[in-house]
């Protein structure tokens, strides 16, 4: 079966029709069967009992995040414009920092990414499913999927599990035939298109910087610096966020992943820039 | 989230050869939000005795006032400086008086007695004293600290070694505890002087 092409059925029209049906069928909607709890036990109650804050650290899921993305147009012909996606890298369970180097920008295709906020496992698993769907779509339709379609598939999938305790807050961002686009998708089933967007425990802090300094037209350098700065300030105020800032720039032609930047280092540079004296002098 | 980790914060103390070190972080928060980064949790009681108060900082302030009040009365009555052993007993009594509605703070005492012997102790919210000879820690980073201190502590450390061990221990703790951090302050208490140093830490 594997490795067969249409050439193998060329001679017989009946076989050809059959082969087409078998090989170009639309993939079924991902309907997973997850292990079920015994009858009478509600999944949400079960999770609360065994995985909430009252449980040990190792039983809690990884959470706490700042992620942001925005669309901008090039200010000069020398700039590329597109989308900036910036995220922190901390995973925490309560006040315990379980990882300092999580990659929260997940690839969906060559031109699309999804960000990760909320339950880390939920995000990783479901974006993998979306990525699979997008790849199959591209093979079948011989054209890349739009951000709109991918995010809608994502949102519909999450909606199917609504009320069962999934925790996902993701931004699907990318470039397609319609241009640069960002869709915010969450586990409540919500999906909305935005130009400027931030998700996670530090999102309000990030919005503070973003709303203040965002312009629809920026140079590439300006835009990248804005993303970095918003993440840096969010990690400073929000104890759920920290580590390094991972940044992805999606231009009309390519997807550029920038090297991770230590947010603490960025903060000290920022304080230097201001000339603010940050040395603490205790007084008796 | 528990009230004990509402404001966050960590205090650690280590004993050396005729010297003690006591250190705290500088963060004060409201759950996940950092409010200020210049709040030390270590307070001077006498020249050679310091107290650290971790936990809910509103209660910690109140308790500190009560400690100072009792200590001042003691010194007036006895006309001599209070010893760390006596102070810890006093704080323990104070804490146990609130057995059925305790302050949400864990006190820690570090200092040198009149023979310059180091004394360190910590207690729970209702005054159960434990005074080991090596190191003590209280606050949201207690578990991380006890682990690293076990590795850094050596018998009879001199003041500079002791400072290094304490500073490295608290910095390691701040790497993993989200509720503490944003800088630290270390007090090295020796028989003739107290050395205060602020340490830069990660600001996230």
UniProtKB/Swiss-Prot annotation, chain A:
Keywords from the UniProt entry: Cytoplasm, Hydrolase, Nucleus, Protease, Proteasome, Threonine protease, Zymogen
Keyword Transmembrane helix: no
Propiece residue ranges: 1-64
InterPro entries: Ntn_hydrolases_N, Pept_T1A_subB, Proteasome_sua/b, Proteasome_suB-type
Annotated localization: Cytoplasm; Nucleus
EC assignment: 3.4.25.1
Catalytic reaction(s) noted: Cleavage of peptide bonds with very broad specificity
Disruption phenotype: No visible phenotype. Constitutive skn-1-dependent expression of the proteasomal subunit rpt-3. Double knockout with ddi-1, sel-1, sel-9, png-1 or skn-1a results in failed expression of the proteasomal subunit rpt-3.
GO molecular-function terms, A-Z: endopeptidase activity; threonine-type endopeptidase activity
Major localisation: cytoplasm
UniProt-listed GO biological process terms: proteasome-mediated ubiquitin-dependent protein catabolic process
Enzyme class at the top of the EC tree: hydrolase
GO cellular component: cytosol; nucleus; proteasome core complex, beta-subunit complex
UniProt-annotated catalytic positions: 65 (nucleophile)
Family label: Belongs to the peptidase T1B family.
Function as written in the Swiss-Prot or TrEMBL entry: Component of the 20S core proteasome complex involved in the proteolytic degradation of most intracellular proteins. This complex plays numerous essential roles within the cell by associating with different regulatory particles. Associated with two 19S regulatory particles, forms the 26S proteasome and thus participates in the ATP-dependent degradation of ubiquitinated proteins.
Subunit structure: The 26S proteasome consists of a 20S proteasome core and two 19S regulatory subunits. The 20S proteasome core is composed of 28 subunits that are arranged in four stacked rings, resulting in a barrel-shaped structure. The two end rings are each formed by seven alpha subunits, and the two central rings are each formed by seven beta subunits. The catalytic chamber with the active sites is on the inside of the barrel.
Protein name: Proteasome subunit pbs-5
Organism: Caenorhabditis elegans
Curated annotation (Swiss-Prot), chain B:
InterPro entries according to UniProt: Ntn_hydrolases_N, Proteasome_beta_3, Proteasome_bsu_CS, Proteasome_sua/b, Proteasome_suB-type
Domain of life of the native organism: Eukaryota
GO biological process: proteasome-mediated ubiquitin-dependent protein catabolic process
KW Nucleus (keyword) present: yes
Entry's family note: Belongs to the peptidase T1B family.
PANTHER family: METALLOPROTEASE TLDD, PROTEASOME SUBUNIT BETA TYPE-3
Name assigned to this protein: Proteasome subunit beta type-3
Organism: Caenorhabditis elegans
Lineage: Eukaryota, Metazoa, Ecdysozoa, Nematoda, Chromadorea
């Amino acid at each position: 079966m594997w490795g067969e092409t249409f050439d193998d059925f060329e001679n017989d029209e009946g076989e050809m029709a059959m082969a087409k049906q078998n090989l170009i069928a639309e993939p079924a909607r991902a309907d997973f069967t997850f292990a079920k709890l015994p009858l009478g036990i509600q999944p949400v109650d079960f999770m609360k009992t065994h995985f909430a804050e009252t449980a040990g650290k190792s039983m809690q899921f990884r959470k706490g995040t700042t992620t942001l993305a925005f669309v901008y147009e090039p200010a000069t012909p020398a700039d590329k414009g597109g989308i900036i996606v910036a995220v922190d890298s901390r995973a925490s369970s309560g006040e315990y920092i379980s990882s300092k180097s999580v990659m929260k920008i997940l690839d969906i295709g060559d031109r699309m990414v999804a960000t990760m906020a909320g339950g880390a496992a939920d995000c990783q698993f479901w974006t993998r499913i979306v990525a699979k769907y997008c790849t199959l779509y591209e093979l079948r339709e011989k054209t890349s999927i739009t951000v709109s379609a991918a995010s809608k598939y994502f949102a519909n999938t999450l909606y199917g599990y609504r009320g069962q305790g999934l925790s996902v807050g993701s931004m699907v961002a990318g470039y397609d035939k319609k241009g640069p686009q960002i869709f915010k998708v969450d586990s409540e089933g919500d999906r909305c298109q935005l130009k400027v967007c931030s998700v996670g425990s530090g999102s309000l802090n990030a919005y503070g910087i973003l709303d203040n300094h965002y312009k629809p037209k920026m140079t590439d350098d300006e835009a990248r610096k804005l993303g970095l700065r918003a993440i840096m300030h969010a990690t400073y105020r929000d104890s759920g966020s920290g580590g390094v800032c991972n940044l992805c720039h999606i231009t009309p032609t390519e997807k550029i992943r920038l090297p991770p930047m230590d947010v603490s280092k960025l903060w000290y540079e920022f304080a230097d820039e201001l000339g603010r004296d940050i040395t603490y002098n205790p007084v008796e | 989230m528990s009230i004990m980790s509402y404001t966050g914060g960590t205090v650690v103390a280590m004993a050396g050869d005729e010297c003690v070190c006591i250190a705290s972080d500088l963060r004060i928060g409201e759950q996940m939000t950092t409010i200020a980064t210049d709040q030390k949790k270590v307070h001077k009681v006498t020249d050679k005795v310091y107290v650290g108060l971790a936990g809910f900082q509103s209660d910690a302030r109140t308790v500190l006032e009560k400690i100072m009040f009792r200590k001042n009365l003691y010194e007036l009555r006895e006309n001599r400086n209070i010893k760390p052993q006596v102070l810890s007993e006093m704080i323990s009594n104070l804490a146990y008086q609130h057995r059925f509605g305790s302050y949400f703070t864990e006190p820690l005492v570090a200092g040198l007695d009149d023979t310059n012997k180091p004394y360190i102790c910590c207690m729970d919210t209702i005054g159960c004293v434990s005074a080991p000879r090596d190191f003590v820690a209280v606050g949201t980073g207690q578990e991380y600290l006890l682990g690293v201190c076990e590795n850094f502590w050596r018998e009879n450390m001199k003041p500079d070694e002791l400072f290094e061990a304490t500073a490295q221990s608290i910095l390691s703790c701040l790497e993993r505890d989200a509720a503490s951090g944003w800088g630290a302050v270390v007090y090295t208490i020796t028989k003739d002087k107290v050395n205060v140093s602020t340490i830069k830490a990660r600001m996230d």
